[in-house]
């Protein structure tokens, strides 16, 4: 982890807001953390600005999820632009869930077990980058671990024995569903709007599974959500997997399923 410039030795960048939460919890006051993809932007198609490219080149670390669309599209250009910045795939060591056609679900942070792995990867990178602060980072990491463990306990208690299914437009809760034995019924088909036939088939499945909730993200709002909600008598609940407030968002999702 080299120092690009003298004035920027204590800055790092993350790709999305949930990673900023983890990074700030561990890095504390030793690093200033900035996020590349702003709130209410789509990380699948986001294009970094020239100012962000400059900020990245002056950062010591760049924490990525590793599977998000814009990360895959821009990875080579970002690394060429910031040769002295250490790029860290925080999902390293996580068993990915496939969505078909060789594409993995990128929402790895929407699982407490995965969040713990991602935080460990951050701790390792920060310790290598600034060895003199290793004990400081380790203490902060332990506190974050406790928060993650408490969140997991809370979610387990909330969802225990429910065996629920839920509808969702964009399949952002695959890891969440897997962790708590839930079934995710997805409206979107591999990034595309479903056909009338696909929509009807999903409605029939929903009538069998009897989900009570339909999760939606603001950036994916469209008429198919209303059609599905009316046809299946489900309650529409807005979620934000890209929220900085990771523990609160995880609990919000679980409470909606209670």
State the predicted function of each range.
Residues 1-258:
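Extracytoplasmic metal-acquisition and chelation regions
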């Amino acid at each position: 982890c080299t120092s690009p410039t003298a004035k920027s030795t204590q800055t790092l960048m993350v790709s999305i807001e949930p990673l900023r939460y983890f990074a700030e919890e561990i890095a504390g006051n030793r690093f200033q953390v900035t996020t590349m993809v702003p709130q209410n932007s789509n990380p699948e198609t986001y294009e970094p600005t020239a100012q962000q490219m400059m900020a990245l080149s002056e950062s010591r670390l760049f924490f990525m999820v590793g599977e998000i669309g814009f990360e895959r599209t821009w990875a080579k250009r970002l690394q060429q632009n910031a040769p002295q910045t250490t790029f860290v795939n925080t999902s390293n060591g996580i068993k990915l869930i496939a969505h078909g056609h060789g594409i993995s679900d990128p929402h790895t942070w929407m699982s407490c077990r995965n969040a713990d792995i991602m935080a460990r990867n951050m701790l390792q990178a920060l310790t290598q980058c600034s060895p003199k602060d290793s004990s400081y980072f380790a203490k902060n990491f332990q506190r974050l671990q406790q928060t993650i463990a408490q969140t997991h306990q809370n979610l387990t208690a909330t969802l225990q024995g429910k065996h629920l299914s839920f509808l969702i437009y964009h399949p952002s809760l695959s890891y969440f569903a897997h962790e708590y034995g839930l079934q995710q019924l997805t409206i979107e088909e591999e990034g595309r709007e479903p056909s009338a036939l696909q929509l009807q088939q999903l409605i029939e499945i929903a009538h069998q599974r009897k989900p009570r909730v339909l999760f939606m993200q603001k950036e994916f709002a469209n008429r198919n959500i209303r059609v599905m909600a009316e046809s299946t008598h489900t309650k529409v609940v807005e979620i934000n997997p890209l929220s900085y407030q990771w523990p609160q968002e995880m609990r919000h999702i679980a409470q909606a399923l209670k």
